Design a protein with these regions (language model features):
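C-terminal motif of bacterial Sec signal peptides marking the signal peptidase cleavage site
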Residues: 18-22
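Pocket-flanking alpha-helical
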Residues: 83-115, 211
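Exported/periplasmic ABC-transporter solute-binding proteins
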Residues: 2-3, 24-56, 61-65, 69, ...
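Bacterial N-terminal signal peptides that target proteins for export
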Residues: 1-12
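Short, glycine-/small- and polar/acidic-enriched structural segments
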Residues: 119-127
Length: 289
């Protein structure tokens, strides 16, 4: 039987809060662009470590390229994992400058442990189904075809706190369909990989994974109001807080949102909030900034 890791994660996070108490008040969530206090006045430098949900990998790698072009003295290092694992690693003492998760629940776990500062929503995502080309198992949607005899279905693990697993469980509740997967993964990219390799007949992933998956077909499903909201925050353990703030601002900028949209991410829920312009270097702007 699977063990719910959220209770253990929260306990570790709360212990970490004792040593981080000096970092101050309660963080809040916002989907607005960068504030004037946070806006970068020029180029930033140094290494910036970003812990980001696995579903963000392709978009964030492109964002990093643009960010480093605008800030030639900077270097961005990523750790892409399931959101719950990233928070657990922070709670256990790993250091990062930025945390970006695939849902607000895992970010709230981090906030409850004093691990992050102000949260800002920067994107949204919904579930979709991917199947190998030709759809050999005859999957028709989020329905009983996923439970048909011989169908090898792969989903994300809700009990491990994986955001796409939580969304999948909510979809089960909304549709009345109880899935019987062959395996449950701790990050959505693992689900995608199993379908791409032909190991699975169907996988429940995000729409962004479906857009980038190779050798697969997408079967869209109504979202039933189940939308994952992606927050980002600088961390209390940041060794380069200025760089972390600059990266957050870049993600929230027009350029950042343009790249996220390119990879299929939806706009933040507060779409009326005006994004910021990406900060240009103090001395010499690059053509591709």
């Amino acid at each position: 039987m699977r063990i719910d890791r959220r209770a253990a994660l929260t306990a570790v996070a709360l212990l970490s809060a004792v040593s981080l108490a000096a970092c101050g008040g309660s963080p809040s969530r916002s989907s607005t662009g960068a504030s004037s206090d946070d806006a970068a006045s020029g180029a930033v430098g140094g290494e910036i470590t970003v812990f980001a949900a696995a579903s963000l990998q392709k978009a964030y790698e492109e964002i990093s390229t643009s960010f480093q072009e605008a800030n030639p003295g900077s270097s961005v290092t990523f750790d892409f994992q399931g959101s719950q694992d990233l928070v657990s690693n922070l709670a256990e003492g790993s250091t990062a400058d930025v945390l970006a998760t695939a849902d607000t629940r895992t970010m709230d776990d981090a906030a409850g442990g004093g691990l992050v500062g102000e949260q800002r929503e920067f994107a949204t995502n919904v579930l979709s189904i991917i199947v190998p080309e030709g759809n050999p198992a005859g999957i028709t949607g989020f329905d009983e075809s996923l439970n048909a005899e011989g169908v090898n279905l792969v989903i994300c693990d809700d009990q491990a706190g994986v955001p796409c697993g939580t969304a999948t469980r909510e979809m089960e509740e909304a549709t009345g369909v109880t899935l019987h997967p062959a395996s449950e993964e701790t990050k959505v990219s693992s689900v995608q990989e199993k379908v791409e390799s032909g190991e699975a007949d169907a996988g429940i992933v995000y729409a962004t994974n479906a857009a980038s998956a190779k050798g697969t077909e997408e079967i869209t499903i109504p979202d039933h109001g189940i939308v994952n909201h992606y927050p980002i925050a600088t961390t209390a353990s940041a060794s380069n807080p200025a760089g972390g703030r600059a990266f957050v601002d870049f993600v929230l900028s027009d350029k950042g949102r343009e790249i996220l949209a390119k990879y299929g991410f939806g706009a933040p829920s507060d779409s009326s909030a005006a994004p910021t312009s990406a900060a240009a270097p103090a001395e010499e702007a690059t053509e591709n900034g």
